[in-house]
């Protein structure tokens, strides 16, 4: 993938640590695809939900993604964007125990404020 136009803005080599995106819906799908376009080579994505038709207007997906698990659909889309990138799917609800096993960069982009608060507390504890 030719990164010559974006390398001055963002060098993917700075992300040597693991990258985790928790929630690949409205915000998470755009964050994921932006990182893939910027040349980040390995990203873990976490989501237990599937895309529905009403998601197409506010999430980085196409009609073909509807009724698919979010993580599976994003893997397909990311391969189209950058075939060299490795996207690792975790088709599950993330728990504080899962957070304890994570290292590196964590993008916490879940919808539920209760869940977000719970996971944020686990992230702070894990620092």
Give the residues covered by each predicted segment.
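N-terminal charged helix/coil linker that caps or initiates catalytic domains
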Residues: 1-20, 53
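Glycine-rich adenosine-cofactor-binding loop
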Residues: 15-40, 44-52
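Alpha-helix C-terminal capping/helix-to-coil transition sites in glycosyltransferase folds
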Residues: 16, 101-104
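Short amphipathic alpha-helical segments
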Residues: 32-34, 57-58, 118-121
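Glycine-rich phosphate-binding loop and adjoining beta1-alpha1-beta2 segment
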Residues: 40-82
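A short helix-to-beta-strand connector/capping loop
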Residues: 82-88
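Conserved SAM/SAH-binding loop
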Residues: 90-97
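ADP-ribose/adenylate-binding Rossmann-like module
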Residues: 105-127
């Amino acid at each position: 993938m030719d990164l010559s136009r974006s390398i001055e803005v963002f060098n993917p080599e700075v992300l040597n640590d693991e990258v985790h995106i928790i929630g690949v819906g409205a915000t998470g799908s755009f964050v994921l695809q932006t990182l893939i376009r910027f040349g980040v080579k390995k990203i873990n994505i976490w989501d237990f939900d599937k895309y529905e038709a009403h998601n197409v207007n506010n999430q980085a997906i196409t009609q073909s993604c509807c009724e698919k698990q979010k993580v599976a659909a994003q893997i397909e889309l990311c391969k189209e964007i950058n075939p060299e990138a490795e996207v690792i799917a975790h088709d599950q609800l993330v728990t504080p125990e899962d957070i304890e096993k994570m290292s590196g960069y964590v993008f916490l982009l879940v919808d539920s404020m209760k869940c977000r608060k719970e996971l944020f507390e686990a992230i702070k504890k894990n620092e």
